[in-house]
Amino acid sequence: MNEVRAGQVGQIAILFERHHRALFRYFVSMHRDRELAEDLVQDVFFRMLRYRSSFDPAQSFVAWMYQIAHNASLDYVRKQRGTVVDIDEFTERRAELASSAPGPEEAAVRKEHLALLGRALDLLPEDKREILVLSRFQEMKYEEIAAVLRCEVATVKVRVYRAVRALEQLFQGLEKEKAS
C-alpha cells in the first residue's frame, strides 16, 4: 500500500489479488448477494485509491481496508433502507468445508441446525451480525476489529460476547419453537 500511497496506483492490482476474495466473502456474508458483493469489492478498491493518502503505514493495512469495507457496506444499507442482511449461505459453506463427510442422519441434523443458525443470524441486529462476521467468519483480531469499528478493544470484546449470547438465545428459541 505504501507504493500506491506514493503514487504508483498500478500496484493496487497486487492488493486486489491478495485481498479481493476475503472482501468478497465479507460482503456476501453481510448482504447475501454475490453481485452486490462484487460491486462493493470494486467500490472498496476505488475508495482505497481515492483515500490512499489517509493510510497510515504505522497501522494495520487490513484494518484500514476493512474500515473502508465497513463504510461502503453502511453506505449501501443507508441507501437501501430496510434491506435484510444475513450470513446463512456463508455459514453453511463454512460448515461444509470444516466437516468431514457425515452419514445421512447426521447430515440432516447438521443441515437443520445450519438453517436454524441462519434464521437466528437473520434476526440479530446488524451491529451484532457484523461483529460476528468480522470476529468469527473473517477471523479478524480484536485489535483489527477495533480499528474497523473505531472503538476500544475492550468494547469489541464486550460486543462479541453480547453478540454470541444473543445468537445463542435466538438459536435456542428457534429450536424450542421448532420442537413445539
Each model region followed by its residue ranges:
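Structural recognition of an alpha-helix C-terminal capping motif at a helix-to-coil junction
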Residues: D39-F46, Q59-N71
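A short, charge-rich alpha-helical start-of-domain segment used by transcription regulators
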Residues: N2-R25, L49
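Short, Lys/Arg-enriched C-terminal cap helix and immediately downstream tail that follows
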Residues: F27, R78-R81, L124, R129, ...
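Conserved RNAP core-binding helix
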Residues: F16-E17, F24, R34-Y51
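Acidic, proline/glycine-rich intrinsically disordered inter-domain spacer in sigma factors
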Residues: E92-R119
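DNA-recognition helix of helix-turn-helix
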Residues: H70, L74, L116, A120, ...
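Sigma70-family region 2
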Residues: R5-A6, R32, D43-S60, K79-R81
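Arg/Lys-rich amphipathic alpha helix in sigma70-family domain 2
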Residues: R50-P57, Q67-D88, P102, R110
